[in-house]
Curated annotation (Swiss-Prot):
Full protein name: Gamma-terpinene synthase, chloroplastic
Source lineage: Eukaryota, Viridiplantae, Streptophyta, Embryophyta, Tracheophyta
GO biological process, one term: geranyl diphosphate metabolic process
Any Gene Ontology CC annotation: chloroplast
Domain topic, free-text comment: The Asp-Asp-Xaa-Xaa-Asp/Glu (DDXXD/E) motif is important for the catalytic activity, presumably through binding to Mg(2+).
Motif DDXXD motif per UniProt: ranges: 353-357
Amino acids binding Mg(2+) 1: 353, 357
Length: 600
């Protein structure tokens, strides 16, 4: 049974001690229908198609709200050299702050920790990775201010940057003899409790009991504090804003670029605002936005050339939303190639997902799966026209990506790994299509054994490695092909978040039952109880994800580990308020703030 922590955890998280399958094997609703005349092949062994009327589903997604001409018209003055020079001057000033005399750092490590935290939340810490690493190396073993706030902030930042700082030794003075957290009477009580709350989300699976206690303890306090603040209307509006934001979703789970945009506004009105940091954050945000605009325009031109958005009127035409995902995964300007190629992969995944979920018949889907597994452009004559379009767009794009790796790195072995990932993806889609067509409802475990693949994260992450690694190595490709924890656990959370945000809409249009419905069918609980259970699983699996950051082989670059973490954060961002991928209105304001409107 799930622990009854719903009242003490944020909206996006509750917790229970449950297990999800971590093996890598792949193994009745009435939808709206439309009638379409289409040639259909009867089986993979039949080459001659047969004309007949096919009853097809329709999801009625609607056209994109972002026209090609509008995207191509995007422009920014922040591409200019004058802003680049301004940015460099500001970076020099901030770098000097981080490189203060060692005696100052030793005397006041809290000041440096707060500076690092602000740089991270403002979205500019990527400029100062070396300086931050040197500072944390010095601070790591230094005694810190004994307050809960100072201890918790240090713990969170060290864990955030990969230091395995011990939890019990850090917080022992704030625990009773049973190891439970206890209240103190310090003046920074709320500030300290908020810091402890945020720090708890970086705990790992072996620390789950401390996690449960810390979240229960801090959440109850913070909710009571907010309620009292709203009644008394005291002066600490800045702290109250931070607390409410954290209770909605903890910092560790948030999409970094949107968090930066939000925090820039909040920081500007804060009591300790540093004008140099603020100016740096604004200028950098606008310069990076200009880079993202050019990336988006590139992907939009590619998408138009494929013709998939126009020809596949049953599928989601969501080039902007697909690009949004990639910015959540890796926003730094130097990774434009990864963003562009990953957005192309996302567009292909979205179209093919809709082929399996919405439009294709089971016979057609078996043909398409077989074609992808064969990876032979000469054997597609038996496919209907819309599937030929999908296959050749996929085939040409992936082969082009392989060619670029060959040209730039003299590495010619990545295509077999990429095509196998796509074949596994289509096989997992086919499993769900068979479940839907037979009316079968799997157990939650059986569903998850397939669904962590069908959610597309393994394909996305394998491509992301190929787009960022230099050099690309056979050892890494073999390692990733076996679905290590960093991929499998990331995919688990993406799937569960996806199901929380989209399952109701998908069932209405006709789709396989998701994790919520599988658990309801298996246990007989209500939908609310099932959703609470899924939130519990997300919290548990996040702790496994925190563990999976460590212990990876050296041939996996740090940037790839970051993408795997950020993919999870992006899923929580995209599905926090429903289906942000399929329902464009749920994402519109965020797209405007990230890609269209500069910060004044």
């Amino acid at each position: 049974m799930a622990l009854n922590l719903l009242s003490s955890l944020p909206a996006a998280c509750n917790f229970t001690r449950l297990s999800l399958p971590l093996s890598s094997k792949v193994n009745g609703f009435v939808p709206p229908i439309t009638q379409v005349q289409y040639p259909m092949a009867a089986s993979t062994s039949s080459i001659k198609p047969v004309d007949q009327t096919i009853i097809r589903r329709s999801a009625d997604y609607g056209p994109t709200i972002w026209s090609f001409d509008y995207i191509q018209s995007l422009d920014s003055k922040y591409k200019g050299e004058s802003y680049a020079r301004q940015l460099e001057k500001l970076k020099e000033q901030v770098s000097a702050m981080l490189q203060q005399d060692n005696k100052v750092v030793d005397l006041d490590p809290l000041h440096q920790l707060e500076l690092i935290d602000n740089l991270h939340r403002l979205g500019v810490s990527y400029h100062f990775e070396d300086e931050i690493k040197r500072t944390l190396d010095r601070i790591h073993n230094k005694n810190t201010n004994k307050s809960l706030y100072a201890r918790a902030l240090k713990f969170r930042i060290l864990r955030q940057y990969g230091y395995k700082t011990p939890v019990k030794e850090t917080f022992s003075r704030f625990m009773d003899e049973k190891g439970s957290f206890k209240l103190s009477s310090h003046s920074d009580e709320c500030k300290g409790m908020l810091a402890l709350y945020e720090a708890a989300y970086l705990l790992v699976e072996e620390e789950s009991s401390i996690f449960r206690d810390a979240i229960r303890f801090t959440t109850a306090y913070l909710k009571e504090w907010v309620a009292k603040h709203d009644i008394d209307k005291n002066d600490n509006e800045y702290l109250c804003t931070l607390v409410k934001h954290a209770l909605e979703l903890p910092l560790h789970w948030r999409m970094r670029r949107l968090e930066a945009r939000w925090f820039i506004d909040v920081y500007e009105s804060g009591p300790d605002m540093n004008p140099i940091l603020l100016e740096l954050a604004k200028v950098d945000y606008n310069i990076v936005q200009a880079v993202h605009q050019e990336d988006l325009k590139y992907v939009s031109r590619w998408w138009k050339k494929t013709g998939l958005g126009e020809k596949l009127n049953f599928a989601r035409d969501r080039v902007v939303e697909n690009f949004f995902w990639t910015v959540g995964d890796i926003f730094e300007p130097q990774f434009g190639y990864c963003r562009r190629m990953s957005a192309m992969v996302n567009c292909l995944l979205t179209s093919i997902d809709d082929v399996y979920d919405v439009y294709g018949t089971l016979d057609e889907l078996e043909l398409f799966t077989d074609a992808v597994e064969r990876w032979d452009a000469t054997t597609t004559e038996q496919l209907p026209y819309y599937m030929k379009l999908c296959f050749h767009a996929l085939y040409n794009s992936v082969n082009e990506m392989g060619f670029i790796a060959l040209r730039d790195q003299e590495v010619g072995m990545i295509i077999p790994y990429l095509k196998k990932a796509w074949a596994d993806q289509c096989k997992s889609y086919l499993v769900e299509a068979k479940w839907y067509n037979s009316g079968y409802i799997p157990t939650l475990q059986e569903y998850m054994e397939n669904a962590w693949i069908s959610v597309t994260a393994p394909v996305m992450l394998l491509h992301a490695y190929a787009f960022t690694a230099n050099p690309i190595t056979k050892e890494a490709l073999e390692f990733l092909q076996d679905s290590p924890d960093i991929i499998r656990i990331s995919s688990m959370i993406v799937r569960l978040e996806d199901d929380l945000g989209t399952s109701s809409d998908e069932l209405k249009r006709g789709d396989v039952p998701k994790s919520i419905q599988c658990y309801m069918h298996e246990t007989g609980v209500s939908e609310d109880e099932a959703r609470e259970h899924i939130r519990d699983l997300i919290a548990e699996t996040w702790m496994k994800m925190n563990s999976a950051r460590f212990g990876n082989p050296p041939y996996l670059p740090d940037v790839f580990i970051g993408i795997a973490m950020n993919l999870v954060r992006m899923s929580q961002c995209m599905y926090l308020y429903g289906d942000g991928h399929g329902v464009q209105e749920n994402t519109k304001d965020r797209v405007l703030s990230l890609f269209i409107d500069p910060i004044p």
